[in-house]
Amino acid sequence: MARTVVLITGCSSGIGLHLAVRLASDPSQSFKVYATLRDLKTQGRLWEAARALACPPGSLETLQLDVRDSKSVAAARERVTEGRVDVLVCNAGLGLLGPLEALGEDAVASVLDVNVVGTVRVLQAFLPDMKRRGSGRVLVTGSVGGLMGLPFNDVYCASKFALEGLCESLAVLLLPFGVHLSLIECGPVHTAFMEKVLGSPEEVLDRTDIHTFHRFYQYLAHSKQVFREAAQNPEEVAEVFLTALRAPKPTLRYFTTERFLPLLRMRLDDPSGSNYVTAMHREVFGDVPAKAEAGAEAGGGAGPGAEDEAGPSAVGDPELGDPPAAPQ
């Protein structure tokens, strides 16, 4: 019996790496996995994980694929020796964290290019053949940060909101083609996903006001707490992908955690958005009287409270991993 051919983007670490070796090592031996990476020099960890799980020979191959380059995507497609991809996993992504006014234009453009346009490039390369064959599955790494706004994740959330619209629109179209598309909505995950583009606290302060600077440190402290309490291992998240892949009638969305569903329901129940905005503000920052808000703006210098909240290494701290409820 022919094996199911799976191609996954973004396999140098995290969810992509763990999903690739999970499928390649599946006891059924029913998957042929193409794990793609932007830079093949980073494939060492992938093969270490494959050896640890005793992936059978021929179950896993690596391909160079840079979602920012349509020629690279097309070249990877041509190297799939079976001539087809049964399951496409769009997983490559970038994160971006910080006050909006402190983010560089190039960093903003890079996140949108990888997370949104990069996903479009991959879909454009592989969807037509699935439609012609009348079968196929597409799994896209989403985020609850694509379903609700998170402070200091403005651009990242914008990119994930865009994926929601892209995928939901395609899912409606693809029904009669026999192609199923599902979003895997992740919360915080223990990965090296987040790219810290901010410099020292002083550099951040130079690019924003003192009040926003204090708020950022409050957010970092909250983020670390949520990460400690709720972050999932990528192996656990990979099982949700497998559930979607094997479902007889896959749904549009699969959630890797239920922790954030109450906030999502609140957002849906109140189309005006006011209840969600108030609830999320309290969740992250607590109740701060208006007088204190004004005082923070008028105060001079960051003061000791800024570092006391989250510690002096909060900016760029690898322990932060993904932003709360916004992993991939």
UniProtKB/Swiss-Prot annotation:
It comes from the Eukaryota. Keywords: Cytoplasm, Lipid biosynthesis, Lipid metabolism, NADP, Oxidoreductase, Steroid biosynthesis. Residues 290-328 are annotated as: Disordered. Substrate binds at residue 143. It is found in: Cytoplasm. GO terms for cellular component: cytosol. The active site is at residue 156. NADP(+) binds at residues 10-38, 66, 160. Pathway: Steroid biosynthesis; estrogen biosynthesis. InterPro entries: 17beta_DH, NAD(P)-bd_dom_sf, Sc_DH/Rdtase_CS, SDR_fam. It catalyses: 17beta-estradiol + NAD(+) = estrone + NADH + H(+); 17beta-estradiol + NADP(+) = estrone + NADPH + H(+). Its main location: cytoplasm. GO terms for biological process: estrogen biosynthetic process. It is an enzyme of class 1 (oxidoreductase). The keyword Transferase does not apply. Pfam families: adh_short. Homodimer. Belongs to the short-chain dehydrogenases/reductases (SDR) family. Favors the reduction of estrogens and androgens. Also has 20-alpha-HSD activity. Uses preferentially NADH. This is Estradiol 17-beta-dehydrogenase 1. It comes from Pan troglodytes (Chimpanzee). The gene is HSD17B1.
